[in-house]
Curated annotation (Swiss-Prot):
Family: Belongs to the bacterial ribosomal protein bS16 family.
Stretches assigned to coiled coil: none
Keywords: Ribonucleoprotein, Ribosomal protein
Protein name listed in UniProt: Small ribosomal subunit protein bS16
Keyword flag Ribosomal protein: yes
InterPro entries per UniProt: Ribosomal_bS16, Ribosomal_bS16_CS, Ribosomal_bS16_dom_sf
Annotated Gene Ontology cellular component terms: cytoplasm; small ribosomal subunit
Superkingdom field: Bacteria
GO biological process: one example: translation
Alphabetized GO MF terms: structural constituent of ribosome
Length: 82
């Protein structure tokens, strides 16, 4: 099953997440189909905290992809801010 979820990157104690489309059987930070955004939970100042390609998200959801709880909350925040 295809899912849209977070893949962790960054350094120890400084997380940075890619929002990716992947097969649910793949490892959390493993192979993915497409990168559709990022989330920086510790963004400060002028740093961008969240970027999403909403068109691609709608495309993948239309193809039957499931969205993780955290990513769905981020999508909701992005739509509210736009």
């Amino acid at each position: 099953m295809v899912t849209i979820r977070l893949a962790r990157g960054g350094a120890k104690k400084r997380p940075f997440y890619q929002i990716v489309v992947t097969d649910s059987r793949n490892a959390r930070d493993g192979r993915f189909i497409e990168r559709i955004g990022f989330f920086n939970p510790i963004a400060t100042g002028q740093a961008e905290g969240l970027r999403l390609d909403l068109d691609r998200i709608e495309h993948w959801v239309g193809q039957g992809a499931t969205v993780s709880e955290r990513v769905s909350a981020l999508i909701k925040d992005a739509k509210k801010a736009a």
